[in-house]
Regions:
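Short, basic/aromatic beta-hairpin or loop at an interaction surface
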Residues: 45-55, 94-108
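Active-site scaffold segments
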Residues: 78-82, 101-115
C-alpha cells in the first residue's frame, strides 16, 4: 500500500490506480482512525493503518450497522456506505491478533459505492448523512 496526498475516485474504477478497482458495492473501503486505534490498542500494537489495506482513512467518525445506506462525503466525493469490511486472515498474517481485534464494532471499516467522480485531498472535510 502506498499513501498519497490526493486521489482521483471514479464510478468506473473506485480509487484510481487501485489494481482491485471496479464498479460495484465494494468499490472503496474506508477505515476510521478511531476504530483502527481501538483495534491496535486491544492488541497492544502500534501499527500503520495501511496494513489494513483500506483505500481511505478518515478521522472523527466511527462506523456501525446503522450507517449502511448513508452517504459519506469527502470533499467533493460522495460515497454510499454499503456494508462492513470484514477482516480476513491477511490481517492475522500482518500481526498476530489483528484479525480478531478488527472484528467487533465494525473496526475493520466499511465498503462503499462511488456516487460521483471527484478528486480528493488529504485534509478534505468528511461528513456522513
Amino acid at each position: 500500500m502506498k499513501e498519497v496526498l490526493c486521489a482521483n475516485v471514479t464510478q468506473h474504477s473506485g480509487v484510481e490506480k487501485d489494481v482491485f478497482g471496479r464498479p460495484g458495492k465494494r468499490q472503496v473501503t474506508v477505515l476510521s482512525v478511531q476504530q483502527w486505534q481501538a483495534a491496535c490498542q486491544s492488541i497492544n500494537a502500534d501499527l500503520v493503518w495501511t496494513i489494513r489495506r483500506a483505500n481511505l482513512l478518515v478521522d472523527g467518525l466511527s462506523f456501525s450497522p446503522a450507517d449502511v445506506g448513508k452517504q459519506l462525503r469527502i470533499g467533493d466525493l460522495s460515497l454510499e456506505i454499503t456494508g462492513e469490511t470484514d477482516p480476513c486472515s491477511k490481517m492475522e498474517m500482518a500481526h498476530p491478533g489483528l484479525e480478531l481485534a478488527l472484528t467487533p464494532d465494525w473496526r475493520g471499516g466499511v465498503t462503499c459505492r462511488v456516487l460521483n467522480d471527484a478528486m480528493i485531498h488529504l485534509g478534505d472535510p468528511v461528513t456522513r448523512d
